[in-house]
Amino acid sequence: MEQEQDTPWTQSTEHINIQKKGSGQQTQKLGRPNLTRLMDHYLRIMSQVDMHKQTVSWKLWLSLRNPTQGSLRTRALKQWKSFNKQGWTN
């Protein structure tokens, strides 16, 4: 059986306190997630998303500044499709 990898998300949301009863049985009690860890994880993910957005917009800016024949064709096709969707209404 494959063991699940411990990620910051699972670490913070699945705190399990195991308590032994007198009979030797184990009970599991879910604890409260550590808010600091949740916030750190959230901020880390959002930072990665922002970096991706910046990279995409930078690549777009570069492609507009130094367009290749392929990028010009793609851009023209996108504009043509959006124009056709709007129709001939003025």
From Swiss-Prot:
Matches recorded under InterPro entries: Flu_proapoptotic_PB1-F2
Signal peptide: none
Disordered as annotated region, ranges: 1-31
Single biological process term from Gene Ontology: symbiont-mediated perturbation of host apoptosis
Keywords for this protein: Apoptosis, Host cytoplasm, Host membrane, Host mitochondrion, Host mitochondrion inner membrane, Host nucleus, Host-virus interaction, Inhibition of host innate immune response by virus, Inhibition of host MAVS by virus, Inhibition of host RLR pathway by virus, Membrane, Modulation of host cell apoptosis by virus, Viral immunoevasion
Superkingdom, natural source: Viruses
Positions of region (Mitochondrial targeting sequence): 65-87
Polar residues biased stretches: 1-29
UniProt key word Cell division: no
RNA-binding listed as a keyword: no
Localization terms from the record: Host mitochondrion inner membrane; Host nucleus; Host cytoplasm, Host cytosol
GO cellular component: host cell cytosol; host cell mitochondrial inner membrane; host cell nucleus; membrane
Principal location listed in the UniProt entry: host cell
Annotated positions for site Low pathogenicity: 66
Other observations noted: Is not encoded in all strains, and seems to be dispensable for replication.
Task of the protein: Plays an important role in promoting lung pathology in both primary viral infection and secondary bacterial infection. Promotes alteration of mitochondrial morphology, dissipation of mitochondrial membrane potential, and cell death. Alternatively, inhibits the production of interferon in the infected cell at the level of host mitochondrial antiviral signaling MAVS. Its level of expression differs greatly depending on which cell type is infected, in a manner that is independent of the levels of expression of other viral proteins. Monocytic cells are more affected than epithelial cells.
Record text on subunit structure and interactions: Oligomer. Interacts with human SLC25A6/ANT3 and VDAC1. Interacts with host MAVS.
Protein family according to the UniProt entry: Belongs to the influenza viruses PB1-F2 family.
Name assigned to this protein: Protein PB1-F2
Organism the protein comes from: Influenza A virus (strain A/Memphis/4/1980 H3N2)
The organism's taxonomic lineage, starting at the top: Viruses, Riboviria, Orthornavirae, Negarnaviricota, Polyploviricotina
Gene: PB1
